[in-house]
Swiss-Prot record:
One of its GO terms (molecular function) is unfolded protein binding. Its main location: cytoplasm. It comes from Picrophilus torridus (strain ATCC 700027 / DSM 9790 / JCM 10055 / NBRC 100828 / KAW 2/3). It is found in: Cytoplasm. Participates actively in the response to hyperosmotic and heat shock by preventing the aggregation of stress-denatured proteins, in association with DnaK and GrpE. It is the nucleotide exchange factor for DnaK and may function as a thermosensor. Unfolded proteins bind initially to DnaJ; upon interaction with the DnaJ-bound protein, DnaK hydrolyzes its bound ATP, resulting in the formation of a stable complex. GrpE releases ADP from DnaK; ATP binding to DnaK triggers the release of the substrate protein, thus completing the reaction cycle. It comes from the Archaea. GO terms for biological process: protein folding. InterPro entries: GrpE, GrpE_coiled_coil, GrpE_head. One of its GO terms (cellular component) is cytoplasm. The keyword Chaperone applies. Keywords: Chaperone, Cytoplasm, Stress response. SUPFAM superfamilies: Coiled-coil domain of nucleotide exchange factor GrpE (SSF58014), Head domain of nucleotide exchange factor GrpE (SSF51064). Belongs to the GrpE family. This is Protein GrpE.
Length: 180
């Protein structure tokens, strides 16, 4: 009977060992599957994180683009409106030559327009600047000095809106008038 029991015990022990091996193999296989799923989930998470960061960056760039576009539209709308006001300023300048009472009106209009970025180009007595001035006449005198402004020029938000039409002195030349 001992041999039978030993065989039985050996058999049970063998089954137990085999069952443990199978369980260990199943756990190992399950752990490997879980590890693969975990690694895939982490990879997917990284992909989604990168996608989110790209989308966020694109959205921020789009918002900056929209803000810039809106500012450009506002600036251009102001520029168009102010350009239409320049002939009014020219008329006031011409009127001031005949009636000094128009000076406060012109000053008030210039003050309002300066709130929108308009600045007058000061040219008289200064060296000629081709970016700010347009020569309409030349007289004898010191080289490249603006002696008279025929028409005021204006700068809007650091861009030339209209150049000043000026008469410039040139050394040794006879007086010429090239007005258009």
């Amino acid at each position: 009977m001992m041999t039978y029991n030993k065989k039985y015990i050996d058999s049970v022990e063998y089954d137990l060992i085999e069952t443990r091996k199978r369980m260990w193999m199943m756990e190992r296989k399950k752990n490997e599957e879980l590890l693969k799923k975990y690694q895939q989930a982490m990879s997917d998470l990284e992909d989604y994180k990168n996608l989110y960061m790209r989308q966020r960056s694109e959205m921020e760039n789009y918002q900056r683009y929209i803000e810039k576009t809106i500012n450009n539209i506002k600036a251009n709308a102001n520029a168009d409106l102010i350009k239409t006001m320049l002939p009014v300023l020219d008329s006031l300048d011409a009127g001031i030559l005949h009636d000094e009472k128009l000076k406060p009106i012109r000053s008030q209009l210039i003050k309002i327009l300066s709130n929108y970025g308009l600045k007058e180009i000061e040219s008289r007595g200064k060296k000629f600047d081709p970016y700010l001035n347009e020569v309409v006449g030349i007289v004898k005198g010191d080289d490249d000095i603006v002696v008279e402004e025929v028409q005021k020029g204006y700068i809007l938000n650091n861009e030339v809106l209209r150049t000043s039409k000026v008469i410039v002195s040139k050394g040794g030349n006879n007086e010429q008038d090239n007005r258009n």
